[in-house]
């Protein structure tokens, strides 16, 4: 079975770990979000790609869900001693090495997709990880700070500001001009099932879908497209997805996120058991829906979520 998964960072990576256990013989291709990418200290940092790579490769800081295990921060301390920032973005020493290698390869002329493949040679994530595009795309958020409306990089909004001010707009800058990375459209066209994990529907999966050609390829693939709600009990499972959902006019509910994706894209939708009342509304929107436990409390629970998604995909296929 060939499975394509659109993935952001922590939520997507943890779901993928469960999917690997649930479908050990499947050929899994992950299309990773690069809208979170940021240039810091002259280096290209790809937080979501690295979170997937580290999580599946056994190098992630399990407690926080991002960054490396057994990390040290000597380089960050030295930069701070020179007065060089930003201090709010915590790159560790081991993590810096990844960004140095990536930036060296890109400077030498390699596209991000080839660089990601080379980095995965070390981590052996057990999936094929492809960035959504080799072109530069960075998500910016329009906010009002000190009475002034301005645009900040998504990382600044998420990490420094902790989404403490309302997001007035979310824009994946560069997405309209971007092209899908080599292998993206081919993987979608050859897939038996396409999954949207419980990643952020606006700044993770939404950004991937903003690259021209990707949404259309998924809609035209002719295979089940199944998503899992990142909203449980009208609140994000983790992170601050409600803040960016509000910016695009979507209420923070499991049903509203399904409607946001739309029946033209989505065939099946899993909601948590606490949101069982949403099933009727989602089905009325033309999307097959079931309520199952959606909390990724451990690997077994996550693997069961993945099995439920694949089961729903079969129901879609037979409908």
Curated annotation (Swiss-Prot):
It catalyses: enolpyruvoyl-2-diphospho-5'-guanosine + 7,8-didemethyl-8-hydroxy-5-deazariboflavin = dehydro coenzyme F420-0 + GMP + H(+). Catalyzes the transfer of the phosphoenolpyruvate moiety from enoylpyruvoyl-2-diphospho-5'-guanosine (EPPG) to 7,8-didemethyl-8-hydroxy-5-deazariboflavin (FO) with the formation of dehydro coenzyme F420-0 and GMP. It comes from Streptomyces coelicolor (strain ATCC BAA-471 / A3(2) / M145). GO terms for molecular function: LPPG:FO 2-phospho-L-lactate transferase activity; magnesium ion binding. Its cofactor is Mg(2+). The gene is fbiA. NCBIfam families: F420_cofD (TIGR01819). Keywords: Magnesium, Transferase. Its EC number is 2.7.8.28. SUPFAM superfamilies: CofD-like. One of its GO terms (biological process) is F420-0 metabolic process. 7,8-didemethyl-8-hydroxy-5-deazariboflavin binds at residue 50. Pathway: Cofactor biosynthesis; coenzyme F420 biosynthesis. Pfam families: CofD (PF01933). Belongs to the CofD family. The keyword ATP-binding does not apply. This is Phosphoenolpyruvate transferase. Homodimer.
